[in-house]
């Protein structure tokens, strides 16, 4: 509907028209501030321009049957849609069923390479990883729903100093807990019960002869062994969140192509040597300073691996590349983009979304850290506590680039303070009514909408606003809009439900048809958030 109304107004006015939702529903379904934009051009008051444009629009043949009213108010032009238009879109939505909301397609389908999570396989996934994981998964769902082609990839950092440190940590734990030796740990190492678990499992799984080899050989084998175990656990954790990747890319394999990348960087005059190090001239592309790629000891920096990986990605020629990183990686954006320019790619194709910190509470106190993982809150612990769906909803309920704090006990309440419960409850009420109704679903679907009051029309309009919510959430990377949409629609439904008996009115079938639309919109919205909406709520819920 939004697209239709915008198109008609732009054709009549021959100007770009911004369509908004009025803050006060008494002002109608849509509004436009176009009069303010034209005030300087025509050197008139916005109030006068709004009156003139409202008259022009209302008398134009293309708007006949679209609106019940077009009113100029304080410089805005407010539009109330006709019931005929609402019914036309309602019928189409009910025919589309689970595809309702996907009819807004981008001008052309994009190929999107989406990389997210990519946590080092050196420990279990913690709550900080979950936010980017859930966001990336839902963004992919929405993009595909809108007709885009999406590849979701997890970049596995399976080489380098962190992996060796993992192997060393397991070896020291093996010596302490299996061999019962007195061990002195280094200042930096991986700790937690999971390291001890791996050490004990290695004792059962690996050949005893391994532990008679020299220490470097033992650490190398344990590094690979522990890394593989951690990656399996990470995949299990992601599965528990309902997240599945199309591809897992190995840094170790991709890094074999580093020589070819360095040759191209040298040809592009992107490198120089200073202080026995090899530097990238990233400052030429808005980086704060040049960056080291090869250190004095001839080892490679973390950035080098990122450059080789991005070269592999950009060879595949996607329309857009989206990375979801932790906010602490902000400084890496400019240097990676600089390397892409030197390698001959368009760095504007790369968009990096940053996930801010998460602070978890329970009874207004910091959530208990996991003994198994040391100073972290594990995803699995929180899923066991509140469930996958509640966790996904909360992580998506605020913009990715804002800090998120929430108390998990809120997600256990059975009232309006728990947003996901309140949405489930709305859908449950609808299904209970449909079961009690003397009318078949087919009767309800075939019932024309003729006798709706303003409040009922507004609720119907809200259900039909789902396509715009989906489109906006994708274009602005603002998936919180989907959560807000579902919360608002559920709240409007509860107000409608509590206002009077629905089944005991002469227009019961019309009202049930609105209820079907509420259920459809909530179900489709939740599906894109990776949540299965409930049709029944039991006492334990």
From Swiss-Prot:
Family annotation (Pfam families): Arg_tRNA_synt_N (PF03485), DALR_1 (PF05746), tRNA-synt_1d (PF00750)
Domain of life, source organism: Bacteria
Short motif ('HIGH' region): ranges: 119-129
Family annotation (Gene3D superfamilies): Arginyl tRNA synthetase N-terminal domain (3.30.1360.70), HUPs (3.40.50.620), Isoleucyl-tRNA Synthetase, Domain 1 (1.10.730.10)
Subcellular location: Cytoplasm
Reactions catalysed, as given in the entry: tRNA(Arg) + L-arginine + ATP = L-arginyl-tRNA(Arg) + AMP + diphosphate
GO CC terms of this entry: cytoplasm
E.C. number: 6.1.1.19
InterPro entries in the cross-refs: aa-tRNA-synth_I_CS (IPR001412), Arg-tRNA-ligase (IPR001278), Arg-tRNA-synth_N (IPR005148), Arg-tRNA-synth_N_sf (IPR036695), ArgRS_core (IPR035684), DALR_anticod-bd (IPR008909), Rossmann-like_a/b/a_fold (IPR014729), tRNAsynth_Ia_anticodon-bd (IPR009080)
Enzyme class: ligase
Biological process annotations from GO: arginyl-tRNA aminoacylation
Subunit structure: Monomer.
Family: Belongs to the class-I aminoacyl-tRNA synthetase family.
Protein name, per record: Arginine--tRNA ligase
Species whose genome carries this gene: Helicobacter pylori (strain HPAG1)
């Amino acid at each position: 509907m939004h697209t239709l109304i915008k198109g008609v107004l732009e054709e009549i006015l021959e100007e770009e028209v911004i369509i908004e939702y009025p803050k006060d529903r008494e002002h109608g379904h849509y509004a436009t501030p176009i009069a303010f934009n034209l005030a300087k051009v025509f050197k008139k008051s916005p109030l006068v321009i709004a009156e003139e444009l409202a008259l022009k629009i209302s008398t134009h043949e293309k708007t006949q049957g679209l609106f019940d009213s077009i009113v100029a108010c304080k410089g805005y032009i407010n539009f109330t849609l006709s019931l005929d238009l609402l019914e036309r879109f309602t019928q189409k939505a009910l025919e589309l069923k689970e595809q309702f909301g996907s009819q807004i397609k981008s001008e052309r389908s994009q190929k999107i390479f989406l990389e997210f999570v990519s946590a080092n396989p050196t420990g279990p996934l913690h709550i900080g990883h979950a936010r980017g994981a859930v966001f990336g998964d839902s963004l992919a769902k929405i993009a595909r729903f809108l007709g885009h082609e999406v590849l979701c990839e997890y970049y596995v950092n399976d080489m380098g100093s962190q992996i060796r440190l993992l192997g060393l940590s397991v070896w020291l734990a093996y010596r302490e807990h299996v061999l019962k030796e007195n061990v002195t740990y280094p200042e930096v190492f991986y700790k937690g019960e999971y390291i001890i678990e791996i050490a004990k499992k290695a004792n059962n799984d690996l050949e005893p002869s391994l532990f008679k080899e020299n220490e470097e050989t033992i650490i190398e084998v344990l590094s690979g062994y522990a890394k593989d175990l951690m990656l399996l656990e990470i995949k299990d954790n992601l599965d528990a969140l309902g997240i599945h990747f199309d591809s897992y890319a190995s840094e170790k394999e991709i890094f074999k192509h580093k020589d070819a990348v360095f040759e191209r960087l040298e040809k592009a005059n992107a490198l120089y040597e200073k202080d026995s190090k090899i530097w990238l001239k990233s400052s030429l592309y808005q980086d704060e300073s040049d960056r080291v790629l090869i250190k004095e000891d001839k080892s490679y920096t973390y950035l080098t691996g990122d450059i080789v990986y991005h070269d592999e990605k950009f060879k595949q020629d996607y329309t857009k590349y989206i990375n979801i990183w932790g906010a602490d990686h902000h400084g890496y954006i400019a240097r990676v983009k600089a390397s892409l320019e030197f390698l001959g790619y368009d760095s504007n194709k790369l968009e990096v979304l940053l996930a801010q910190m998460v602070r978890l509470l329970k009874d207004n106190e910091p959530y208990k850290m996991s003994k198994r993982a040391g100073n972290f809150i594990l995803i699995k612990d929180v899923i066991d506590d509140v469930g996958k769906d509640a966790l996904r909803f909360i992580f998506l309920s605020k913009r990715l680039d804002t800090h998120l704090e929430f108390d998990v006990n809120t997600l256990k309440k059975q009232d309006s303070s728990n947003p996901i419960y309140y949405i489930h409850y709305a859908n449950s009420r609808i299904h209970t009514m449909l079961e009690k109704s003397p009318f078949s679903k087919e009767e309800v679907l075939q019932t024309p909408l003729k006798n709706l009051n303003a409040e009922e029309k507004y609720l119907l309009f809200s259900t039909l606003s789902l396509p715009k919510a989906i489109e906006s959430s994708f274009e602005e990377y603002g998936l919180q809009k989907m959560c807000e949409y579902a919360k608002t629609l559920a709240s409007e439904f509860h107000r409608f439900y509590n206002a009077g008996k629905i089944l005991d009115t002469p227009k019961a079938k019309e009202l049930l048809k609105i209820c079907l639309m509420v259920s459809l919109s909530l179900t489709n919205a939740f599906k894109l958030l990776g949540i299965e909406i409930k049709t029944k709520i039991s006492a334990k819920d």
